[in-house]
From Swiss-Prot:
Name of the protein in question: 3'-5' ssDNA/RNA exonuclease TatD
NCBIfam families, per the entry: PRK10425.1
Xref: HAMAP family: TatD_exonuclease
Gene from which this protein is expressed: tatD
Membrane listed as a keyword: no
Organism: Pantoea sp. (strain At-9b)
Function: 3'-5' exonuclease that prefers single-stranded DNA and RNA. May play a role in the H(2)O(2)-induced DNA damage repair.
Similarity remark: Belongs to the metallo-dependent hydrolases superfamily. TatD-type hydrolase family. TatD subfamily.
Keyword check for Repeat: no
Entry's Gene Ontology molecular function annotations: 3'-5'-RNA exonuclease activity; magnesium ion binding; single-stranded DNA 3'-5' DNA exonuclease activity
Length: 260
């Protein structure tokens, strides 16, 4: 089982990053993709991945929250990072019209620029979409023939949005959001609609701690070592064996991100 979304650069991991990675290994997690959300964190993510060759990789990109800081210098930084063997995707990039930390036009500009970069470098894209599906799809669609792959990270949309993402050829990233009885029930019902070869799993640690873990962790911080719980629950709701699902999502991640 491979965790495609770990925010290991977060200050919440500042005191025990190495132990976090060790616990993930001990839990049977077969690899980690460390998320880059701005130029600085993308550089930090690449360095962290360097420390764990063959186990950790990273993305390089600018999250829509940070889109207002996009510049030609940012693009050049990402391009340089993408030359390293650790960086296997462009992103996290996309649109977030829920919190609007950057203006919509800034988000759209940075998103389009990163799709162009991914097409140029022939790297898959690690996508973010929240309450912005129509504009997200409109910007993404023209680039699809030029992209080598894409995943809708932390998908939390509707059935119609899921069907649209699948029709665009996207892989679907599912997090512990689906384990939340308050807001994950609709998503839970959609799990069987995702083709096995398009499904990816992620913790989005330190965020989105699964709410249905028993006993509950003493800390509210999520960790990649909790991925087996997500695998177990998603397998249950898809009516398949957890071991089979774990092997499938590991295979899917390695295929999408072209890992050795």
């Amino acid at each position: 089982m491979f965790d495609i979304g770990v925010n290991l650069t977060s200050t919440q991991f500042a005191k025990d990053r190495e132990q976090v990675v060790a616990r993930a290994r001990d839990a049977g997690v077969t690899g980690l993709l460390i998320t880059g959300t701005n130029a600085l964190e993308s550089q930090q993510a690449q360095r962290l991945a360097e420390w764990h060759p063959g186990y950790c990789w990273s993305t390089a990109g600018v999250h829509p929250h940070h889109a207002s800081a996009w510049s030609a210098e940012t693009a050049n930084t990402l391009r340089r990072l993408a030359e390293s063997e650790q960086v296997v995707a462009i992103g996290e990039c996309g649109l977030d019209f829920n919190r609007n930390f950057s203006a919509h036009d800034q988000q759209e500009y940075a998103f389009d620029a990163q799709l162009q970069l991914a097409a140029e470098l022939q790297l898959p894209v690690f996508l973010h979409c929240r309450e912005a599906h129509d504009r997200f799809a409109a910007i993404l669609q023209p680039w699809l023939p030029k992209l080598v792959g894409a995943v809708a990270h932390c998908f939390t949309g509707t059935r119609e949005e899921l069907e649209a993402c699948l029709a665009m050829g996207l892989s679907i990233g599912i997090t512990g959001w689906v384990c939340d009885e308050r807001r994950g029930m609709e998503l839970r019902e959609l799990l069987p609609l995702i083709p096995a070869e398009r499904l990816l799993l992620e913790t989005d640690a330190p965020w989105l701690l699964p709410r249905d873990m028993h006993p509950r962790p003493t800390s509210r911080r999520n960790e990649p070592c909790f991925l087996p719980h997500i695998v177990q629950q998603v397998a249950l709701w898809r009516n398949e064996a957890a071991e089979t699902l774990g092997a499938q999502v590991d295979h899917n991640a390695r295929q999408l991100f072209r890992l050795a």
